[in-house]
């Protein structure tokens, strides 16, 4: 498929790091007992003079805790910058974010939802039902981080979704990590097409090896989603940005710089 519309800018926001003592939770049977550090990002998109935020990062209140905090799945979250301060540096107020979408509802992706209660929230029906169902803890979700979104303007979707109707920003349904997990396909004027992975894999090697984390909700869906993204990369000539791949993350410009 081919789409001509392009976004104006993509800002990569630093959402801290995540640390685990046993990397095999992301690759069962491999790297057992080895520590692992993962990058965490949120992404600010400028399109048609409007602002969209993809994920909200690890909660800003960790800025006062240099040792971080174990939040879920035994993962320790640490931040060195707040999302709010990075938006301020760009010159954007939280209330100016018109559209909010989340790859999924784990803590490092929903930590600052409270800042964006004026935005229209786009969410897969399957993810919404897991987030607000009887047992969010079964999915590793923390409702205190995102519960306020119930009062946002809501756009419930099922499957792929063209956010602006012009092909520039397309939500790709990639379930398995969570029931309604999504990735994002962007078209940039200079960089070209980019897929923001969400958590379909936590580094490039795990993507290539089709490693399925032990806490994913559906292993078969997880592999199918990785296969689908690989096919999408080939069809679109797109580059994969693996959110938690700390080596790749070090090569990307971060806010206030941007990709165009």
Model regions and ranges:
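Short, electropositive alpha-helical surface patch
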Residues: 107-113, 180, 250-260
């Amino acid at each position: 498929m081919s789409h001509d519309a392009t976004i104006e800018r993509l800002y990569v926001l630093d959402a801290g790091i995540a640390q685990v003592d046993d990397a095999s939770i992301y690759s069962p049977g491999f790297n057992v007992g080895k520590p692992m550090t993962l990058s965490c990002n949120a992404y600010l998109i400028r399109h048609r003079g409007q602002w969209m935020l993809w994920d909200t990062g690890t909660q800003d209140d960790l800025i006062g805790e240099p040792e971080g905090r174990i939040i879920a799945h035994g993962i320790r979250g640490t931040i060195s910058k707040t999302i709010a301060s990075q938006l301020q540096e760009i010159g954007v107020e939280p209330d100016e974010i018109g559209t909010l979408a989340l790859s999924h509802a784990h803590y490092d992706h929903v930590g600052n939802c409270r800042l964006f209660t004026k935005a229209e929230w786009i969410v897969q029906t399957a993810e919404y039902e897991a987030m607000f169902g009887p047992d969010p803890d079964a999915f590793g979700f923390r409702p205190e981080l995102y519960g306020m979104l119930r009062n946002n303007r809501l756009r419930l979707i099922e499957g792929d979704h063209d956010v602006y109707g012009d092909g520039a920003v397309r939500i790709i349904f990639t379930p398995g990590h969570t029931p309604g997990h999504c990735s994002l396909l962007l078209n940039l004027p200079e960089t070209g097409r980019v897929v923001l992975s969400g958590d379909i894999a936590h580094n490039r090697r795990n993507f290539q090896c089709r490693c399925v984390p032990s806490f994913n909700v559906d292993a078969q869906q997880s592999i199918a989603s990785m296969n689908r993204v690989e096919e999408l990369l080939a069809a679109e000539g797109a580059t994969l940005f693996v959110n938690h791949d700390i080596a790749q993350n070090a090569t990307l410009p971060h806010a206030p710089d941007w990709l165009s």
